[in-house]
UniProtKB/Swiss-Prot annotation:
Glycans are attached at residues 37, 80, 114, 173, 222, 470, 495. It comes from the Eukaryota. Keywords: Aminopeptidase, Glycoprotein, Hydrolase, Protease, Secreted, Serine protease, Signal. One of its GO terms (biological process) is proteolysis involved in protein catabolic process. Optimum pH is 7.0. is active between pH 4.0 and 9.0. It catalyses: Release of an N-terminal dipeptide, Xaa-Yaa-|-Zaa-, from a polypeptide, preferentially when Yaa is Pro, provided Zaa is neither Pro nor hydroxyproline. This is Dipeptidyl peptidase 4. Pfam families: DPPIV_N, Peptidase_S9. The gene is dpp4. Residues 1-16 form the signal peptide. It is an enzyme of class 3 (hydrolase).
Amino acid sequence: MKYSKLLLLLVSVVQALDVPRKPHAPTGEGSKRLTFNETVVKQAITPTSRSVQWLSGAEDGSYVYAAEDGSLTIENIVTNESRTLIPADKIPTGKEAFNYWIHPDLSSVLWASNHTKQYRHSFFADYYVQDVESLKSVPLMPDQEGDIQYAQWSPVGNTIAFVRENDLYVWDNGTVTRITDDGGPDMFHGVPDWIYEEEILGDRYALWFSPDGEYLAYLSFNETGVPTYTVQYYMDNQEIAPAYPWELKIRYPKVSQTNPTVTLSLLNIASKEVKQAPIDAFESTDLIIGEVAWLTDTHTTVAAKAFNRVQDQQKVVAVDTASNKATVISDRDGTDGWLDNLLSMKYIGPIKPSDKDAYYIDISDHSGWAHLYLFPVSGGEPIPLTKGDWEVTSILSIDQERQLVYYLSTQHHSTERHLYSVSYSTFAVTPLVDDTVAAYWSASFSANSGYYILTYGGPDVPYQELYTTNSTKPLRTITDNAKVLEQIKDYALPNITYFELPLPSGETLNVMQRLPPGFSPDKKYPILFTPYGGPGAQEVTKRWQALNFKAYVASDSELEYVTWTVDNRGTGFKGRKFRSAVTRQLGLLEAEDQIYAAQQAANIPWIDADHIGIWGWSFGGYLTSKVLEKDSGAFTLGVITAPVSDWRFYDSMYTERYMKTLSTNEEGYETSAVRKTDGFKNVEGGFLIQHGTGDDNVHFQNSAALVDLLMGDGVSPEKLHSQWFTDSDHGISYHGGGVFLYKQLARKLYQEKNRQTQVLMHQWTKKDLEE
């Protein structure tokens, strides 16, 4: 079956792993070197993990998984008892089943099949409702043709909200009611358009049932006036190219262009009455709704987190569903940078029975560091639950009975994640793992927070264990990745270390270094910088580092590159000041930091300062371009993959968050664009530009314009190399494009390592061309 198989958890109880993990990445015990085929063509050594779909309608600790025979099975981790929910031969559409969602009372299953991917998160599918007792199933819509965009169970009752052709519908015990009738190419109800899916909500839905199931809040997006961008597909998934390319037309607002307008509506499930909520925190053309959350146990209050267009002003607007009256209960000025949409609002209610106020929990960085706060639903000053020069990265679960919030933070170091709980009644903080040891943890909690699967994510080989929140001893091991531990014994792996590089300005940059196997300080090694560097991003972490292309270039005896990944200013989890420094000037400080790091690396005796490369993808490709443009001489090779070259070409909601509008920052946009060519002319080993022609995110336009600039200004063909990947999107994988890309990159690195300082050049590079 195509849906994820969530395998049966191990029954035997173990108190500890057979092989304890170390606070550093493994280096292997053997002599084998990683090969291209093992790291790129197929990642042969890859740890696995298991996830479960915790059930809210059963005893806490129950979850559902697909057994080896394909049947849906419910198991309780306390009793180790299991029962079949749906036999494999009774699953509707059989092997075409793509995913499933269990009704909260376990009476029915909602199946998706015949799915077609749309954008990063969204897909179209057919949906079926199956009764668990009779095993009979019915289509959500009798005439469905793989065209339903989203469907979701209500938490109470036998109701499903779903979206088809951008219109909202409600399914009640088999009866379908159409709620909206103006959905179409320019109007979306309950699902996001491209830009909200990609940049704001990060998901494929825009509807939320109230906790009691009596109301549904949903967003609508009107794209009237939003400019269209056309992506051409030359092969269109055919063996022989059609005479005319297939064209995908996307409403794609670029900088200073018209954005979609957004509204919040409230649907009474029983009466089917719809009211538009008055979210007038900003003018309609200046409004972004980033989050919707019910601040109630029933349906009395719903809140919208509203931002202005450039996302440096924020207001939380609470709406009373009975009166449809809106009140601003929280506001924030973030004009020193930007305000991230963290999607972290969680209702907890009154803290004490005598309290008149109810509260919700949210993450805010208004102190300069991202921390947990209690916010009164009626408005007022927030109460801090955590504080310090470190950041809370996510809320994992809230146990309202014990009044505990479970969260991850960088308290030990910005490159690490440790698991804690904090009481929102006593403010006591408790680590659930040893937070004095370098590690990268995460966890998945049961519906009532009584149990959790703890995942050790690195730097050593990952594993998972099952815990009860009443004990610090594991109930059992879920995944030990013993196979990976055994595999790596035969290899000599790159040695990964971490350090902080001080800047002259006083800040420090996190650096992850890979040294080739068998490293000797008596040799000289070329070095490859591999930045991403985008706002709020983080590449330097103590996660398990995949044995991928970066491991290969350090391992291949004909390459043996040292690699440095440097998180420059603007990246995340080091405080607001550090990340906000790049506001209105993307590409400036980031490039300065990468150049400074390269200059420091060049002073290391075992680094070959004549062969220092840099390669980045997406924002990393843009950053590589800006580094070369600086003409610092610090780098001798650049590989630029799927870059932005001019921020006017990218979408408005991402770009204006950091750069603000073109009319208020024209100089900043001009400086941030790649405009100067001398650095490209002077980079000794040349550079390579790669891009997919079907990229619907960072459009091929960026690389086309960059190459035109460089050619037009006389950059020689010895220096300028470019590669287009037909119909590939931002990930570059279509028709073998991914393997080709990495082969090409390996070839460039080999050529750079063996490049002599005196390069033989054709005569046209030795003198100016005459008209």
